[in-house]
């Protein structure tokens, strides 16, 4: 849900890219994993997998830091192959432009690093068995592989009163997480490691982001009332993300503590900082606070909603829909600023010998 600010943002700086929630802690864990994994002998490349790469901005710093650690452990010309993966509809052109153009790209820092991309869902096996030395996934596994059912009273199932829908989403979330870790267990080389940053729930089972999601739901209702959206389109509009508890995250490993040779080396959940709120406390600019969260929602969440239009991304109303929705969400959040509650889970998984 939360990604670093794009370069065209008026508040974008070199330092702000790392501030996507939880990345600092996750990158530190990834660097430790890079120190620990066994390395293949040259000329066999070291394989690093980035599961859920999106446009690449969240991958720049983690991949660069992991590659720097790996490079210190091997020859200067030992090839490091990075496989960026995402669903087929991902904008891989944007990903490759990020890797080519951004000064923080590992391609500019390590001449023996090489890039590849895979346009398939990571809820199946997408890389050969026993080939991945180091894996990374941030802000990706909270997205479900499919929408299990419709519900009409909110844009997010966590805030729906439809008990059957909530149960269906929970079942899908359990299946997806099981498949994700099982197939990574197959892909990882012996003693390979995978670091995952994803949405969690707090001690009360709350996924967070309530004010943002309520603002989106309210703005969509207004669009339907005003005639921009049809009621059947509104009913289809859902954001299929989930937060998982520590119990949920451990479930695939029960009762033996392993799945496909994979075990949990580290697992924690924590409350993440709302950096926009921290900024607001300094400048008290409510309009900027609302605009920043709305811009993030536009980048991370609105594309999913656009697909629910009768014409999908080609619908002639798509641009107007997104523009109006962003403005309405910004206005709602600016009218009553409050910190966004969010919980994250950070895990390091290791393959047995």
Predicted regions and their residues:
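Soluble or luminal CAZymes and related metallo-dependent hydrolases
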Residues: 22-25, 172-176, 241-245
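Mobile active-site "lid"/loop adjacent to the S-adenosyl-L-methionine
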Residues: 137-176, 198-235
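Short, conserved SAM-binding segment of the class I
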Residues: 130, 176-183, 187, 252
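Helix-to-beta-strand junctions that scaffold the AdoMet/dcAdoMet cofactor pocket
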Residues: 149, 188-190
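N-terminal charged/capping segments associated with class I S-adenosyl-L-methionine
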Residues: 1-130, 143-161, 196, 201-202, ...
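Substrate-binding/catalytic lobe of Class I Rossmann-like enzymes that use SAM or dcSAM, i.e.
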Residues: 190-314
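Short, Asp-centered acidic motifs that coordinate Mg2+ and/or phosphate
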Residues: 134
């Amino acid at each position: 849900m939360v990604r670093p600010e794009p370069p065209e943002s008026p508040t974008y700086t070199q330092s702000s890219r790392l501030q996507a929630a939880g990345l600092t802690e996750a990158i530190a864990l990834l660097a430790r994993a890079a120190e620990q994994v066994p390395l293949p002998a040259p000329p066999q490349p070291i394989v690093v997998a980035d599961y859920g790469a999106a446009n690449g901005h969240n991958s720049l710093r983690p991949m660069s830091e992991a590659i720097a650690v790996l490079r210190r452990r091997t020859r200067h010309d030992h090839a490091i192959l990075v496989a960026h993966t995402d669903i087929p509809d991902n904008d891989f052109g944007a990903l490759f432009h990020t890797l080519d153009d951004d000064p923080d790209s590992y391609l500019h820092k390590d001449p023996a690093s090489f890039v590849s991309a895979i346009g398939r869902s990571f809820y199946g096996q997408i890389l050969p068995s026993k080939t991945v030395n180091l894996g990374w996934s941030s802000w990706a596994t909270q997205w479900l592989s499919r929408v299990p059912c419709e519900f009409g009273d909110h844009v997010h199932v966590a805030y729906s009163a439809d008990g059957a829908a909530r149960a269906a989403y929970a079942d899908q979330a359990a299946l997806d997480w099981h498949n994700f870790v099982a197939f990574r267990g197959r892909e990882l080389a012996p003693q390979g490691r995978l670091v995952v940053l994803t949405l969690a729930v707090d001690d009360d089972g709350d996924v967070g982001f309530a004010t943002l999601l309520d603002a989106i739901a309210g703005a969509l209702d207004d669009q339907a009332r005003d005639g921009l959206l049809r009621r059947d389109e509104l009913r289809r509009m859902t954001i299929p993300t989930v937060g998982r508890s520590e119990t949920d995250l451990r479930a695939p490993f029960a009762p033996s503590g392993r799945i496909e040779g994979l075990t949990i080396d580290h697992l924690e959940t924590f409350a993440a900082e709302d950096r926009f709120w921290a900024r607001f406390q300094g400048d008290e600019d409510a309009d900027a606070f609302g605009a920043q969260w709305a811009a993030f929602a536009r980048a991370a969440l609105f594309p999913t909603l656009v697909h629910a239009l009768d014409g999908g991304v080609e619908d002639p109303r798509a641009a107007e829909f997104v523009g109006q929705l962003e403005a309405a969400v910004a206005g709602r959040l600016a009218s009553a600023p409050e910190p966004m509650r969010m919980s994250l889970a950070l895990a390091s998984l290791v393959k047995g010998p």
